[in-house]
């Protein structure tokens, strides 16, 4: 007997419609619909055809239910660019990442989440009063999202210094960070809460600077928009964008360093200080009033001409997960192979690798089987 919801999950993970899968598997759409709704059980021949078309281990379809991840529970970065297929692939990545996190959590004690709840700083939530001043709104009009970023910096002891590694910062405060699969190119990033645990999934095909900003953007969604009644739309995206800019380029540091009417040459040098994209720094200078509208437009044109609109010449190296690297390192010492993890999760190693920043292919396979340590003896991962 197969788990019908896993058949749906596998199909969506591959970005297929019911029609497309029925064509590949040689099964009528009506019959496939019966399989997915649990009204009928596929014959051995039909199951073999589905396994081949979807490229999942057969055991995947017999395992327990995987908790759903509805679109309304997720904050997507730049959702307007997504097709339905890309959204399905992304959400399926999130569900599988949550399964992997459960596997890790059964064997390691990870850091507890330490994200402040700053939902009262959001103007997008339905429970935020619109007729009274927002917390953090100063007489000078500092946007609440910017003030929220300042509070996060203060709580985490960051001061006004640049953030050296955005992924490590998220993980140091209990956020579970995973990577998106390569067939999810149109999704920059997304985040969600699951039973009090924050998750962020990032697209690793973007520039390192873009990924850092996406990670900060998703942190903005997590702290500003909360776990329930998550707001969506342009206003929520604008809030998370302002939060990310303020977190990575705090106003106090920008004002202390940036000249009025900064040149392109200054931007290309200073972006390395904050470890951000040149376009992001140009936008930050403008929103802080350090450049005029005309200067900002000129900067954008000049940076685009130099190749900085979609790329970051001579950019940073990509950040990766410190927690996952430590987990896999500890498993190697115990003789646990990546194939063991994939087997436990009923996945191919390639699908596992997609979730973990490519760390599977760089891990050295151990030889012996792991010992069955009780959960109470799980090693605790601590970040420096």
What are these regions (language model features)?
Residues 1-384:
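Short juxta-domain linker segments that transition from a proline/glycine-rich
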């Amino acid at each position: 007997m197969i788990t019908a919801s896993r058949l749906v999950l596998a199909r969506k993970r591959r970005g297929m419609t019911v029609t497309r899968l029925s064509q590949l598997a040689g099964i009528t759409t009506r019959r496939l619909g019966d399989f997915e709704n649990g009204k009928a059980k596929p014959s051995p021949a039909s199951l073999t055809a589905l396994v081949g078309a979807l490229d999942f281990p057969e055991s995947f379809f017999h395992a327990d239910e995987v908790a759903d991840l509805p679109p309304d529970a997720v904050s997507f970065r730049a959702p307007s660019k997504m097709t339905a297929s890309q959204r399905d692939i992304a959400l399926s990545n999130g569900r599988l990442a949550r399964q992997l996190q459960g596997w890790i959590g059964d064997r390691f004690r990870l850091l507890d989440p330490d994200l402040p709840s700053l939902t009262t700083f959001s103007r997008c939530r339905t429970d935020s009063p619109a007729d009274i001043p927002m917390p953090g709104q100063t007489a000078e009009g500092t946007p609440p999202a910017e003030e929220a970023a300042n509070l996060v910096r203060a709580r985490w002891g960051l001061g006004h210094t640049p953030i050296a590694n955005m992924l490590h910062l998220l993980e140091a405060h209990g956020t579970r960070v995973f990577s998106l699969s390569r067939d999810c190119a149109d999704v920059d990033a997304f985040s969600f809460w699951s039973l009090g645990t924050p998750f962020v999934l990032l697209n690793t095909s973007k520039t390192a600077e873009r990924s850092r900003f996406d990670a900060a953007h998703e942190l903005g969604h997590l702290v500003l928009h909360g776990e329930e009644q998550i707001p969506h739309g342009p206003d929520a995206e604008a809030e998370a964008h302002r939060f990310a800019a303020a977190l990575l380029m705090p106003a106090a540091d920008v004002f202390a360093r940036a000249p009025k009417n900064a040149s392109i040459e200054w931007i290309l040098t200073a972006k390395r200080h904050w470890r951000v994209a040149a376009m992001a720094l140009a936008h930050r200078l403008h929103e802080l009033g350090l450049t005029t509208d005309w200067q900002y437009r000129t900067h954008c044109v000049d940076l685009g001409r130099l190749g900085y609109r979609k790329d970051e010449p001579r950019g940073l190296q990509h950040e990766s997960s410190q927690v996952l690297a430590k987990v896999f390192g500890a498993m190697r010492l115990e003789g646990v192979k990546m194939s063991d993890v994939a087997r436990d999760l009923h996945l191919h190693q390639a699908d596992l690798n997609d979730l973990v920043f490519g760390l599977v292919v760089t891990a050295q396979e151990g030889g012996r089987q792991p010992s069955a340590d009780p959960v109470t003896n799980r090693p605790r991962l601590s970040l420096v």
